[in-house]
Amino acid sequence: MTKTMLNIYRQQTIVQRLSKAAKGETMRAVGGWSVATLVLALCVPTLARAQDQECGDIGAIVRQAYPNAVADGERTMKTGNRTLTLPSPSSINPHAIVCRRWRGRPGLLLVAIPLIAEVGVDSTLGDLDVLVVDEPTGTPRHRLRIPHAMDDDAVRISRISFDTAPYRFGPDRLAFGVRREWVGSSRPNPFMETTLSLYEPRGAALAPVLDDLIVERSQGQWDLSCAGETVVTERILRMVPGQKGQDISVLERITQSTSREAKNGECSTTDQAVAPRTIRLSFDGKRYDVPRLIQRR
């Protein structure tokens, strides 16, 4: 079993266990972890969540954004036929509201509000409301509702987060990112993926600038013991001068790993790096065109 594949499976197992999505499953595959490793694995998502919940009274923001919303539980509210979930510091919930200060625009908050219509055994239906909020007053200044952004099936959305890297593509033009992380439910075919979308405030709205670029992907297949293959793709973004502003240069790195049982019974892994390539995304003055092969559909 490759190291990357094991990490994918371990992360999937933790997410499934903590979200109670793997009822009846055991932690046998991660039983060999040291206490320090387990603590680190559990603390990393906790620290990440803390960064995405730094906006104080989320309830006050929700009340201004949805004045007709009504309480529907201890940490849930209803607006029409949609359910909003307030974040909890003690649990992981990919449907909970996410909030972060926009470092590039002091005084503004970034808020992502999943609007869930239905949660089934193997699927979820819902939209995502993305807001830029005035921090002193909690008043929404820019807003965009993204239909079906929370829809999933056997490949589940495991986390929503903000990316506040300085995506500057013109004079006084700054975008922020929304990342969606996905995780598969199959043990023999582990899968994880992260997509990035960029949004720019325009008037009272938010304009999509970049749609669902796949920035990370890990996928593989193995026999649940040793033999298997994994492909890990990573894409790193850099702003570069273009004809109509700043283009995006995407550095793509791919690593292929193969694992086989050796004659001595040990599991042997071979990693092979594919030659990196660079993909240029041109800015047309309003948005970037993403090739279909590197975009989630």
Where are these regions (language model features)?
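Bacterial N-terminal signal peptides that target proteins for export
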Residues: 8, 18-36
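Cleavable N-terminal signal peptides
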Residues: 37-38, 48
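N-terminal signal peptide c-region/cleavage motif recognized by signal peptidases
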Residues: 43-45
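Acidic, small-residue rich beta-repeat scaffolds with periodic aromatic anchors
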Residues: 49-85, 189-207, 211-297
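Solvent-exposed N-terminal domain segments of exported/luminal and surface proteins
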Residues: 51-125
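Structural signature of eukaryotic scaffold interfaces centered on beta-propeller domains
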Residues: 95-105, 158-171, 237-244
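Acidic/hydrophobic-patterned starts of short beta strands in beta-sheet-rich repeat architectures
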Residues: 106-115, 168-182, 244-254
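Short N-terminal edge-element motif at the start of the domain
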Residues: 107-170
